[in-house]
Amino acid sequence: MSPFILTLAERGLYPDAIVRWGIRQLLKQRLAEIRSGDVETAAQRELRFIDEMSRAPIAVLAEKANEQHYEVTADFFGHVLGPHLKYSSAFWSAGAATLAQAEAAGLHETCLHAALNDGQNILELGCGWGSLTLWMAEHYPGSRITAVSNSHSQRAYIEAQVRERGLEHRIRVVTCDMNRFEIDPGQFDRVLSVEMFEHMRNWPELFARIRRWLTPEGRFFLHVFVHRAASYLFEDRGPADWMSREFFTGGMMPSDELALACQDHLACVARWRWDGTHYEDRKSTRLNSSHIPLSRMP
């Protein structure tokens, strides 16, 4: 795909149907790479990925993630997200007819699967615009929540919401790169992370730190998007790698089994899966609300 074609797409000069067609062509290229070779080749490729991951920093190019995602203003996201500003996948349950309902269903499911109870001390890693943190504070009024983000604008937005809702004594927001984040050990009943680990690289080391932060009976809840079979990095290898260059620099697509290969410090006790169509429906809903004036674009 030529730079000229991508430039026209960035300027919004193609109808949505053409943009979707282009995305499908790029996806076909990626799938062809993943499916190359026999089952042994695929297994060895995954083992190499795990080995390289375990020797990397916890996160790479964290400043790029901020530039591309997290220092974009809340005003912009207010036009393209639902009322909770949930930056991660929504859950289109049978009763969810609107994005607001699907966001709420996703937040409810997360708390249910994380086995939250009122009165717990909770740490959220990668809190985004505070959708889960504020939801937990509302539904578990006896709990204390520490929310971590690498974005100053996200912290400012969440703290404004905290003041508006009178939650100053229950929510603490920390701005820190995950490479440097540390906190007193043994204090959290629950650690939650929703769609942050795709921006991380060394999962085993971060799992080890999370284990230190948990109480002896504490649990960690991890939500990531995955490919069913293969892990891969988003690397800028040429003009067609728009996603890697402009939106997800330093990110990864984990495989469905990747976390199970990182159990030296934490053991998996339960797993759930949301079908990828929940993400597809969310993206379609965002698209329908994303035709906003250029003056609002970041």
Where are these regions (language model features)?
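Conserved SAM-binding loop of SAM-dependent methyltransferases across substrates and taxa
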Residues: 129-141
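Conserved Class I S-adenosyl-L-methionine-dependent methyltransferase catalytic core
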Residues: 30-113
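A short glycine-rich, Lys/Arg-flanked "PGG" loop and its adjoining helix->strand segment in the class I
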Residues: 204-219
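Conserved SAM-binding strand-loop segment of SAM-dependent methyltransferases
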Residues: 165-180
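Substrate-binding/catalytic lobe of Class I Rossmann-like enzymes that use SAM or dcSAM, i.e.
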Residues: 226-228, 232-284
